[in-house]
Amino acid sequence: MAGVSPAVFGCPDVTLGRNTAVREVQENVTSVDSLTLVSSNTDFAFSLYRKLVLKNPDENVVFSPFSICTALALLSLGAKSNTLKEILEGLKFNLTETPEPDIHQGFRYLLDLLSQPGNQVQISTGSALFIEKHLQILAEFKEKARALYQAEAFTADFQQPLKATKLINDYVSNHTQGKIKELISGLKESTLMVLVNYIYFKGKWKNPFDPNDTFKSEFYLDEKRSVIVSMMKTGYLTTPYFRDEELSCTVVELKYTGNASAMFILPDQGRMQQVEASLQPETLRKWKNSLKPRMIHELRLPKFSISTDYSLEHILPELGIREVFSTQADLSAITGTKDLRVSQVVHKAVLDVAETGTEAAAATGMAGVGCCAVFDFLEIFFNRPFLMIISDTKAHIALFMAKVTNPERSMNFPNGEGASSQRLESKRLCFGDPLCLIGQ
């Protein structure tokens, strides 16, 4: 059995040849390659988002499209034939226009870009392979995983599932600053490999909210129901703004110090489904290109922390990624034989938004101050369900996406098809994806 484990946004402290790799990739990867990857990542993000929302329409949603894409792209290094085609096309790549090697070089470029030092935003991202100690992994796969995806390799004794589980979870916890503590559970003795991709993000608002201004206020779940939340407030803020009359929503961008920003999309009352149905890469480009600096007299945003847990092996087949979960899976580029298939893809994410900024992690297994004229008076209150997209402004990649339907919600749902468990956390954003591989 082989497994791919959840990815957490974060970067290993040691990566061989990183500076050399950055120079080589910058020389060999064109801007077209990276733009293609960014567009495909956005397309995949919105497609997955619609599936998650369809299964749980009234729940909070938070996930890292980049983490999930990276885990699956890394897995595709070991895939052949139709299994390979399904994975890459499921990630929204046009294989006629973008050859497979260009896709992997694009990920290499973005991962190197995200891990460059000196940024005021803390972004850590990386991958790890946990391999059954008796399993022979092809040297070519291991080297490509290291060179293209910065993947570290470790041996594990899956004949002792509890010990192997602790090894993997400790690794993820350490690389997500303790935000993702239990990425995987229930490993079986038949597990042969677990692939983990992680990402960790921590950013400070360029214009932080004053905690002394935070107050209790109503958040309207719908036209009839509301809850009391901690509402942050700021005033006389000059920030990118766009009013989309066509989709009946307001778009505001709040910047972090460094190369990151958060885009907030606030649909008019009753217009959330209309906005969700229109989510396409072209829509995001339109919003970004239409944002203009605007003085906002008062902006209110709830302080919140949400956590989700998804079993993606039930959702990815709906996006065309099917064969890798079946006995027809061809992952022979990993071991040289067709003896592996993916049994589980778990994605865990934690998102916290507070006065000073945002902290996030994920794992996949598999204010300008000024004066405002009376006629320019503008108030924006995020006191009803809204969307949030966190992006790296240098790589132009969407790192996290969230839908906040209830900032105060704390629920547990049974793990199942499309199920998620949500709990309140504080000051963090983490993502993790594990892919579990088993023998056939």
Swiss-Prot record:
Residues 357-382 are annotated as: RCL. Keywords: Adaptive immunity, Apoptosis, Cytoplasm, Immunity, Nucleus, Protease inhibitor, Serine protease inhibitor, Thiol protease inhibitor. GO terms for molecular function: cysteine-type endopeptidase inhibitor activity; serine-type endopeptidase inhibitor activity. Pfam families: Serpin. One of its GO terms (cellular component) is extracellular space. It is found in: Cytoplasm; Nucleus. Its main location: cytoplasm. Belongs to the serpin family. The reactive center loop (RCL) extends out from the body of the protein and directs binding to the target protease. The protease cleaves the serpin at the reactive site within the RCL, establishing a covalent linkage between the serpin reactive site and the protease. The resulting inactive serpin-protease complex is highly stable. Variability within the reactive center loop (RCL) sequences of Serpina3 paralogs may determine target protease specificity. This is Serine protease inhibitor A3G. It comes from Mus musculus (Mouse). The gene is Serpina3g.
